[in-house]
Design a protein with these regions (language model features):
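Short, acidic, metal-binding catalytic loop of nucleotide-sugar glycosyltransferases
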Residues: 1-4
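Active-site-proximal specificity loops/subdomain of glycosyltransferases
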Residues: 12-64, 70-76
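Acidic donor-binding loop at a coil-to-helix junction in glycosyltransferase catalytic cores
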Residues: 187-196
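Active-site donor/metal-binding and catalytic loop motifs
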Residues: 176-185, 203-213
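Short coil/turn segments at secondary-structure boundaries
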Residues: 21-23, 75-78, 106-108, 185-186
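Long, low-complexity intrinsically disordered regions enriched in Ser/Thr/Pro/Gly
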Residues: 6-11, 24, 28-29, 97, ...
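Conserved catalytic core of nucleotide-sugar-dependent glycosyltransferases
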Residues: 79-180
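Short, solvent-exposed loop/turn segments at secondary-structure junctions
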Residues: 14-16, 40-42, 68-70, 98-101, ...
Length: 213
């Protein structure tokens, strides 16, 4: 998308096949930029937190996408950046993410999906977060009923602020100047810190913008 100035790939792996693939991408696409682990330590999810120190440029909006996101709707970047700019009061903003526990919760309470029982609004809920069979069924449900049919807009549920609660940061946007205020120092679990601890310390909410998938 033209609105994207740079595509950073966080190289948090020792797998040489993956690294060579990343290098080929950077050679082929001028916008691709490889970011190496700032401390030179690669330890899976435990070494992700250091990368945020390089996400503090002022006058910049950062959008973090997990590497297992396989589809997003046309104009996702434009719509989410506009929402981010129009709603500066939130710390993080996120679109609707299929197979994200709190996104599933919103689909449930807005009667967009019928589940076998009521599931609570908990990021680590045993079924809607950790059950692989549930995840597979959810993806099939989305693809067969909404994606292939071109009806995914029917799942939009609007704007939902939230606070003092963890959520999966599969796709989130923040302002570089806000991250710069604490130098991008993210201790421990980046998801717990960025979705719950830091916004709570700042007295801010996060917001789901569920008019984008």
């Amino acid at each position: 998308a033209d609105i994207v100035d740079r595509n950073d790939i966080w190289v948090n792996t020792r797998n040489m096949v993956d690294i060579e693939f990343f290098k080929k991408l950077a050679q082929k696409y001028p916008k691709v930029n490889l970011v190496w682990q700032p401390d030179g330590v690669v330890n899976g999810i435990a070494s992700i937190n250091a990368f945020y120190r390089d996400c503090c440029d002022k006058d910049t909006i950062y959008m973090k996408l997990d590497d297992d996101v396989v589809w997003f709707e046309p104009e996702l970047f434009e719509k989410m950046v506009k929402f981010r700019v129009d709603n500066p009061e939130y710390f993080l903003v996120s679109p609707l993410v299929i197979n994200n526990a709190l996104s599933t919760y919103l689909l449930q309470v807005h009667n967009k999906i019928k589940l076998d029982k009521y599931y609570m609004s908990i990021c680590g809920e045993r079924t809607i977060c950790f059950d692989g069979w549930f995840a597979a069924d959810l993806h099939d449900w989305f693809m067969e009923k909404y994606l292939i049919a071109g009806k995914y807009q029917e799942l939009y549920v609007g704007k939902h602020p939230m606070g003092m609660a963890r959520f999966s940061i599969n796709c989130v946007l923040w302002f570089g100047n806000e991250m710069a205020e604490f130098k991008g120092e993210v201790p421990g679990d980046d998801e717990e810190f960025l979705s719950c601890i830091k916004p709570t310390q700042l007295g801010k909410a996060n917001c789901f913008f569920k008019t984008d998938i």
